[in-house]
């Protein structure tokens, strides 16, 4: 396949597939061991098998910590890491822009505004999650109403997304300015910085299906995503319905991002850093790239969350850590590899 740039990168080798499959699982097991209450890897593995076979002692302190606190956090961290990485990769290909992120079309800002409004009016976590997701979708619809139309290019959508994102960010600032400084403002501020502290099985049941369906659809059509990086005339020559492909890609990536942000707040860098890292290692071919983004995104976010909840007495906001870890790592990676181009 040719285009602006050749889609470099062959099919993943069997060894690479095994490593990408095992890596997040190993990191997840280690994350279950780490925390203020230390649990040995052997005990964690025993507990997992006991849960599967129905022989687990669910009343013990270690079991309660494992299954009621750490497990839902790790599941959510893995889903969010994979989801934001896949969304970032999709948007970068869709807009042929290496700086595109899941917030390019304003979805993160809209979701944050929805959460801020819900928290301002005293909604519980589940309602906040639902309202945040709804406003994320509304933000994307506004972006496409403003940026799409006859004779308009994808750059118009990007510019509209920047404007809509700025509008919702300003509205969030307004909500914070009128919120009660003692009870409401700290909750909004901490939520906006990202945290998995509110993870639970009920919230996962609400948000996880959206993420999983979105990622599954993008995974199934991953080979077609290579076509998005071609000029329009070459893309049409392949016989693919480009408008339909773009629509499906945007809908899936938007739904994934809105669901991620609605469950844990705004998490920066993941949707930019992980796709770049995977492109540098595995090339631009989405057949290999998307599975790599899923695995590396899960691994990265589980590690970040483990540090966030274990490094200090007070939990560190996720976005702080992703920036502190991501920015230097990304700079080093760019200097060593020379970057990548679509």
Regions inferred by a protein language model and the residue ranges of each:
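Alpha-helical transmembrane segments in inner-membrane proteins
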Residues: 2-342
């Amino acid at each position: 396949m040719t285009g602006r740039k050749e889609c470099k990168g062959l099919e993943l080798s069997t060894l690479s597939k095994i490593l990408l499959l095992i890596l997040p699982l190993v990191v997840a097991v280690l994350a279950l061991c780490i925390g203020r209450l230390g649990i040995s890897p052997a005990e964690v593995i025993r507990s997992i098998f006991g849960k599967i076979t129905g022989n687990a002692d669910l009343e013990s302190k270690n079991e309660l910590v494992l299954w009621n606190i750490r497990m839902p956090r790790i599941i959510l961290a893995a889903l969010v890491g994979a989801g934001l990485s896949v969304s970032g990769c999709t948007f970068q290909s869709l807009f042929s822009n290496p700086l595109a992120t899941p917030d390019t079309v304003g979805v993160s800002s809209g979701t944050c505004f929805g959460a801020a409004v819900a928290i301002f009016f005293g909604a519980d976590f589940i309602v906040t999650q639902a309202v945040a997701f709804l406003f994320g979708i509304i933000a994307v619809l506004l972006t496409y109403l403003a940026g799409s139309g006859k004779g308009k290019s994808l750059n118009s959508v990007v510019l509209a997304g920047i404007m809509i994102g700025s509008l919702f960010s300003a509205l969030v600032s307004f909500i914070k300015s009128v919120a009660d400084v003692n009870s409401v403002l700290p909750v909004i501020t901490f939520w906006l910085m990202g945290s998995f502290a509110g993870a639970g099985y009920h919230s996962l049941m609400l948000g996880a299906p959206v993420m999983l369906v979105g990622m599954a659809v993008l995974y199934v059509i991953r080979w077609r995503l290579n076509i998005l990086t071609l000029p329009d005339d070459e893309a049409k020559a392949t016989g693919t319905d480009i408008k339909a492909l773009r629509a499906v890609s945007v809908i899936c990536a938007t739904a994934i991002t809105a669901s991620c942000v609605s469950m844990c707040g705004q998490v920066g860098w993941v949707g930019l850093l992980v796709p770049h890292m995977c492109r540098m290692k595995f090339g631009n071919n989405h057949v290999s790239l998307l599975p790599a983004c899923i695995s590396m995104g899960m691994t990265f976010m589980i590690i970040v969350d483990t540090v966030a909840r274990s490094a200090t007495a007070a939990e560190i906001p996720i976005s702080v850590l992703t920036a502190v870890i991501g920015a230097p790592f990304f700079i080093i990676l760019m200097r060593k590899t020379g970057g990548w181009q679509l």
